[in-house]
Amino acid sequence: MKISLIVPTFNNLNYLTFFLSSLKKNSLYDHQIILHINDGSDGTLNFAKENKLLFTYSRSNIGLCSSLNKAAELANSNYILYAHDDMFFCKNWDLYLVNEINKFTDNLFYLTGTNVSVNSGLINFDCGSTPENFDEKKFDEFCKNDLSKDLQGSHWAPHLIHKDLWKSVGGFSEEFNPGDGSDPDFCMKLWNKNVRVFKTISKFKVYHFSSVTTRKRMIKLNNGTKRFTLKYGFNPRYFRKYYLKGDGSNVYNGPLNNPKMNFEMFLDYLINKLKFIYYKI
């Protein structure tokens, strides 16, 4: 099964080439890889041209959301997978995804990989902090032997949805550029389209070098919490807790249900309404 991978990148060539090497080495199927290159003056643009990679381009950094939407315009498969440029995909990652996709009779699902990182992943396991000191054998052995369960309530990259669903929600909301709050907003839009399967696939593991692009660059982040609250009436934490059940430890047990109001939820709702009023002032 062919998947269209969309990958925004901003002068991060060393990590990007490492990411691409993992796809070449560890994919069972041939996939469409689409970059969106922001700036590219570090050699990324020339690298893409010389290697005949498929890409869209902007002279400056247009933000995560706009980058993803630009790249997605070129997608020609039924499934779109968004990935970071500083990830390393495990062996047979696509086989695990395809096996999962084949379980569904409709397209109302959102599937994600399991982030492994030094100290900021769903699973914390040190295999290195850069491509140069990455212990690939250690990562492979960990992926082979780990018995973690699939989890409930995912809202993070890498994530896959059907192309029709992507179009239905209009991709990523560009008012969240440069990107803070964009993932929960995307999931909220899917929720409003009756998606109730938000599932993390344990076997589909990626090693993530901790959002290197955002950390290294002097990028002024937007206030995603404020924008999300003004848009939906509650903040991303409330959405993750009561809708997605996504605290990173809930084992997947089927499609989610609409949240039922209890005393704790009601108190949080009142607090969120006060925050909403504060943001509106």
Residue spans for each PLM region:
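Short, acidic, metal-binding catalytic loop of nucleotide-sugar glycosyltransferases
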Residues: 21-30
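A short, conserved alpha-helix in the catalytic core of glycosyltransferases
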Residues: 96, 152-161, 165-170, 176-204
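Glycine-rich, basic loop-to-helix element that forms the pyrophosphate-binding segment
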Residues: 58-75
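Cell-envelope/extracellular polymer assembly enzymes that use nucleotide-activated donors
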Residues: 2-4, 32, 185
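Short aromatic/hydrophobic "clamp" motif used to bind/position activated sugar donors
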Residues: 80
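C-terminal, non-catalytic tails of nucleotide-sugar-dependent glycosyltransferases
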Residues: 110-113, 125-151, 155-160, 197-198, ...
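Conserved donor NDP-sugar-binding/catalytic core segment of glycosyltransferases
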Residues: 91-129
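A conserved acidic beta->alpha catalytic loop
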Residues: 29, 37-46
